[in-house]
Amino acid sequence: MFMFFINIIFINNFLNNYKTYIIYIYIYNKWNNYNKNYNYNYIMIMITMGLNITCEQTVMFNPYYYLLYYMYIKMLMLMLMLYYIMLYYIMLYYIMFMIMLYYMIYMTL
């Protein structure tokens, strides 16, 4: 769940400041121990800072929007699950009905 939240943060380059990126990159490199090029990440931070300066409007971090996005995705997933469950039961009852019909026809012959 925490890694999912980190991914949500990393796909945005304009909703967080560079300090947040430094913290998350430090955590990522600490837990990982495969990536040894620590300088590349900070170069990327400098690039994102430059792009943030070129932006005409900066938005401060507000978790409400992240929660809204998370809830939206959760609702989509729930609807999808319910759809497939409904499909499963509809197909089940359809097959049962066809078997029953076939059985009735077979018994009447």
Swiss-Prot record:
- Keywords, comma-separated and alphabetical: Mitochondrion
Places the protein is found = Mitochondrion
Q: Keyword Mitochondrion, does the record have it?
A: yes
- The reply on keyword Mitochondrion is yes
Record's Gene Ontology CC terms?
Answer: mitochondrion
Identification of the protein by name: Putative uncharacterized protein Q0144, mitochondrial
According to its UniProt entry, this protein's organism is Saccharomyces cerevisiae (strain ATCC 204508 / S288c)
Lineage, please? Eukaryota, Fungi, Dikarya, Ascomycota, Saccharomycotina
